[in-house]
From Swiss-Prot:
Membrane topology of this protein: Single-pass membrane protein
Gene that encodes the chain: tatB
TM annotation in the entry: 1-21
Record-linked PANTHER family: SEC-INDEPENDENT PROTEIN TRANSLOCASE PROTEIN TATA, CHLOROPLASTIC (PTHR33162:SF1)
Keywords tagged on the record: Cell inner membrane, Cell membrane, Membrane, Protein transport, Translocation, Transmembrane, Transmembrane helix, Transport
Keyword Oxidoreductase: no
InterPro entries the UniProt entry points to: TatB (IPR018448)
Protein name, UniProt field: Sec-independent protein translocase protein TatB
Single GO biological process annotation from the record: protein transport by the Tat complex
Length: 220
């Protein structure tokens, strides 16, 4: 390692024996030999690491050369397919950029059209449709209002017995009925005098005798 010959080594031992003496010379020799071993091991590890790195570099270079040679030796069909794929990718990129540019926000140069003149003739507004639906529902509302008023009047009349109800129906059929508008019924409230007259008619009907019902078999 250090290129020391036998004569030089013998000279070093003689100098060490004179300087250190026979007692400390063996200890000095052992320490020096240990240092030499460590230095040799370090040198060996460094050499191994350098050799491995050189081998890896050579392998990488060889792989690159093989790849380049394989690309150069490709068949024309593979080259054409690769070119088509590249062109398709570029076309997709261009179409995406065009779509993104066309979808511009509503700015001063591209305002939102809200004027009635800009609406097409075939488009109809939504307000007439709502008005037609409201007019279609108006008769149903009027019928419901009249039914509720009639029910309230019928519930307000006192019912004593089944006979009075039957006689009341006969009386109602015999008397003429006048048409009353929904507005008149809603506007005119029922007074106390009218309630008293209804009560008096009910008591008169209950006090009267039972009506005779003619059947085909004879009188009852």
């Amino acid at each position: 390692m250090f290129d020391i010959g036998f004569s030089e080594l013998l000279l070093v031992l003689v100098i060490g024996l004179v300087v250190l003496g026979p007692e400390r010379l063996p200890v000095a020799v052992r320490t020096v030999s240990g240092w030499i071993r460590t230095l040799r091991s370090l040198a060996a590890t460094v050499q191994n690491e350098l050799a491995q790195e050189l081998k890896l570099q050579e392998l990488q270079d060889s792989l690159k050369k093989v790849e380049q040679a394989g690309l150069q030796n490709l068949t024309p069909e593979l080259k054409a397919s690769m070119d088509e794929l590249k062109e398709a990718a570029e076309a997709l990129k261009r179409s995406y950029h065009v779509d993104a540019g066309s979808e511009a926000p509503h700015t001063i140069h591209n305002p939102l059209v809200t004027e009635p003149e800009a609406i097409h003739d075939g488009v109809t507004p939504a307000e007439p449709a709502t008005q037609v639906s409201a007019l279609a529902q108006a008769p149903n509302i009027l019928e419901a209002g009249t039914a509720s008023v009639v029910d309230s009047v019928v519930e307000a009349a006192p019912v004593t017995t089944v006979k009075s109800v039957v006689q009341g129906e006969v009386l109602v059929k015999s008397t003429p009925v006048q048409e009353v508008g929904l507005a008149d019924v809603m506007d005119k409230p029922v007074t106390k005098q009218q309630i008293d007259t209804i009560d008096s008619h009910g008591t008169d009907l209950s006090s009267a005798g039972p009506s005779r019902i003619h059947q085909p078999g004879g009188d009852q």
